[in-house]
Amino acid sequence: MIKKSAAILAGGKSSRMNYINKAFLKYEENYFIERIIKALEDYEEIIIISNNPEEYTEFGLKVFKDIYPSQGPLSGIHSALNYIKNDYCLVVACDMPFINKEVVNYLGNIKEDYEILIPKFQERLQPLCAIYKKSCKDIMEKELINNSNKLIKTCFKFSMKVVEEFPFIEKIHKKEIKNFYNINTVHEYEDLIRKKEI
């Protein structure tokens, strides 16, 4: 058991997905959110951040609303850090159907000498599959109050440890290397399903 919390961010408007709740898109017979919950099962606590908590009752998890709604993923992370019981929280977006258990467990077991532990994959930082220290919430709140809600910009206000190497990555099946791949548009989702059926 990893003595950290995990939070699934499911509060976005999904405007590029015709306002469909991306958490309930299906891949291989399971909702995205079901696949993510399964990958996070070794974390001591799992919560969901959503402004529609009634949609998630079937999963038996605590669901909390954004403290500062309609301010993007920074608001979701800030809310999660206010509600978790542990000092560190892995944050995952609900539109990442390939979240891999081995990857998130590897992150969760890295020594806690950071405020933010953030993977870098294919030359890009991945703030929506990263671990945040609970104490980050205070500076995040100041940013939200000032309407400065840019996530990456805010991350640079903290001591970050960047993870660029995953020693086991070559052992992971090709489709699971997409751990950080997210679905933003109807076209991307249709393309995902089409490739699965080929």
UniProtKB/Swiss-Prot annotation:
Its cofactor is Mg(2+). InterPro entries: MobA-like_NTP_Trfase, Molybde_CF_guanTrfase, Nucleotide-diphossugar_trans. One of its GO terms (cellular component) is cytoplasm. The keyword Transmembrane helix does not apply. Its EC number is 2.7.7.77. Disulfide bonds: none annotated. Signal peptide: none annotated. Coiled coil: none annotated. Mg(2+) binds at residue 95. The keyword ATP-binding does not apply. GTP binds at residues 9-11, 22, 66, 95. PANTHER family: MOLYBDENUM COFACTOR GUANYLYLTRANSFERASE. Transfers a GMP moiety from GTP to Mo-molybdopterin (Mo-MPT) cofactor (Moco or molybdenum cofactor) to form Mo-molybdopterin guanine dinucleotide (Mo-MGD) cofactor. This is Probable molybdenum cofactor guanylyltransferase. It comes from Clostridium perfringens (strain SM101 / Type A). The gene is mobA.
